[in-house]
């Protein structure tokens, strides 16, 4: 890429063996800039919150975590699985310094949609340094432990975790807000020292 930039050649078209043909060099330069950033694995002050919910309890928790993280001045991408599919989540993960994952416990396990996304993300081998887990449950509550295992297998340092039996009360909501702030502060410190 450096050779392209310094060659002095006037490039009018880029036609790779695989992928789109570029005739607009302004658009190609934007894509090239993104590719350089992504291949260098530079991370931003960004947190991706991935969650799914059955009866809205986990979503309530996610919203309070989001509020806490945003109050600390970092970028937050909310990725509820009822609105985003896994490739869209993977795109947001490229430059994220933290991932916070939440799901309800279902049949002594995590919600199936989260297992799918986490398996997919694990295979992409992102270098996300920090994470946290949260979730709601009614009986057994194994979800957080399993979410934690997924993230740890990806090399993510778990900053904190919260679980709520049934609908989160005010105490749990405050804990979620603080979790968001805590992860955001870890991210800011990481980027500062990067």
Predicted regions mapped to residue ranges:
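Short acidic loop-to-helix transition motifs that present clustered carboxylates
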Residues: 81-87
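Accessory terminal helices/loops
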Residues: 1-75, 82
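FMN-binding flavodoxin-like domain, especially the glycine-rich phosphate-binding loop
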Residues: 1-21, 64-77, 89-194
């Amino acid at each position: 890429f450096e050779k392209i930039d310094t060659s002095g050649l006037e490039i009018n078209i880029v036609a790779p063996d695989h992928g789109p043909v570029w005739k607009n060099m302004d658009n190609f330069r934007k894509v090239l800039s993104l590719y350089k950033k992504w291949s260098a694995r530079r991370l931003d002050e960004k947190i991706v919150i991935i969650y799914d919910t059955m009866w809205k309890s986990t979503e309530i928790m996610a919203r309070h975590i989001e509020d806490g993280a945003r109050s600390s001045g970092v970028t937050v991408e909310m990725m509820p699985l009822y609105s985003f599919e896994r490739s869209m989540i993977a795109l947001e993960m490229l430059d994220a310094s933290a991932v916070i994952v939440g799901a309800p416990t279902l049949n002594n396990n995590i919600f199936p949609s989260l297992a799918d996304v986490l398996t997919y993300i694990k295979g992409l081998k992102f270098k996300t340094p920090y994470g946290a887990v949260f979730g709601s449950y009614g009986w057994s509550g194994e979800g957080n432990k399993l979410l934690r295992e997924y993230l740890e297998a990806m090399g993510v340092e778990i900053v904190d975790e919260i679980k709520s039996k049934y609908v989160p009360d005010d105490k749990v909501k405050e804990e979620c807000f603080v979790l968001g702030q805590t992860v955001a502060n870890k991210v800011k410190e990481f980027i500062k020292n990067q």
